[in-house]
Amino acid sequence: MSKPAMRVAVTGAAGQIGYALLFRIASGEMLGKDQPVILQLLEIPDEKAQKALKGVIMELDDCAFPLLQEVTAHSDPRTAFKDADVALLVGARPRGPGMERKDLLSVNAQIFTAQGKALNDVASRNVKVLVVGNPANTNAYIAMKSAPDLPAKNFTAMLRLDHNRALSQLAAKSGKAVADIEKLVVWGNHSPTMYPDYRFATVGGQSLAKLINDDAWNRDTFIPTVGKRGAAIIEARGLSSAASAANAAIDHVRDWVLGSNGKWVTMGIPSDGSYGIPEGIIYGVPVTTENGEYKRVEGLEIDAFSRERLDFTLKELLEERDGVKDLLK
């Protein structure tokens, strides 16, 4: 007997990331090869965007995915999020020429306040929300604060792209396979301030830090390369990273829903006060996932260099939070 279909809402569905994401969800890569899905796709109520969305839906139809039960197009979050089991909030206002970061925050605060309220009112009470649209941590915080009837733990931000970028750099440096590297952590904000930390990482039970044994590389090459990778891709491609972001979103939700099999993964989640991070801030931490729940890895030692890096990315998150405080009243 087949499982009941899961409803997956995706915002910004006709955008670059959406285009790289939807076909993989429909093929079963995110929720499992035996899990039927209904896609509820949201785009802005603009004729051009809605027309583009219709084209994407035509292509989804033309793939004849056995797991794809239904696809609907929406311009209103209140219909797009109806009974959603998973919500991928991909659409956000990008930073335009001459726009200050605070302008970006206030424009996105309006979008994510409205989407948080809609989730609060119409989504499944167990909805799993992943915010991909930047600034992802603060957008997730805004949505969470706008949805008081939903558990705060349902709201997460995507740090998995940073995690995967760090994995790939470490594999290249150490000559080891990506799949063999375990216990990598990325702390903080999804921004260049984030702190990729391989002090606990292992390869085949051996310490990766001891194997690499290069503090200067860690400080001067590894951390900045991971932090500025998005900008490097824009510089090379002329467009932001879409396929790798979509891939990270698939990884994040797949592990959250189906479990990480004991492996550490990075998720931006509401802080419980551990690691000196104020409660409620959406901050990247290591977690393991099982039975649809994530559990933070606790008790990791924070040395002086790491404390400095954790506080540096926290400072940015607190500034962002304070920048949107008045908009959340």
Curated annotation (Swiss-Prot):
> Pfam families annotated for this entry?
Ldh_1_C, Ldh_1_N
> Disulfide connectivity?
none
In the record, what lineage is assigned to the organism producing the protein?
Bacteria, Pseudomonadati, Pseudomonadota, Betaproteobacteria, Burkholderiales
What is this protein identified as?
Malate dehydrogenase
Q: Which InterPro entries match?
A: L-lactate/malate_DH, Lactate/malate_DH_C, Lactate/malate_DH_N, Lactate_DH/Glyco_Ohase_4_C, Malate_DH_type2, NAD(P)-bd_dom_sf
Give the Gene Ontology MF terms in alphabetical order: L-malate dehydrogenase (NAD+) activity
Q: What is its EC number?
A: 1.1.1.37
Instruction: Give the encoding gene's name.
Output: mdh
Q: Which residues bind substrate?
A: R95, R101, N134, R165
Residues the record lists as binding NAD(+): G12, A13, A14, G15, Q16, I17, G18, N108, Q115, V132, G133, N134
Q: Where is the active site?
A: H190
CDD domains hit by this protein: MDH_chloroplast-like
SUPFAM superfamilies (alphabetical)? LDH C-terminal domain-like, NAD(P)-binding Rossmann-fold domains
- Keywords annotated in UniProt: NAD, Oxidoreductase, Tricarboxylic acid cycle
Q: Which residues form a coiled coil?
A: none
Please cite one Gene Ontology biological process associated with this protein. tricarboxylic acid cycle
For whether the record's keyword set contains Nucleotide-binding, the answer is no
Question: S-adenosyl-L-methionine: is it a keyword of this entry?
Answer: no
Q: What does it catalyze?
A: (S)-malate + NAD(+) = oxaloacetate + NADH + H(+)
Q: Which organism is it from?
A: Bordetella petrii (strain ATCC BAA-461 / DSM 12804 / CCUG 43448)
Q: What does this protein do?
A: Catalyzes the reversible oxidation of malate to oxaloacetate.
Q: Which family does it belong to?
A: Belongs to the LDH/MDH superfamily. MDH type 2 family.
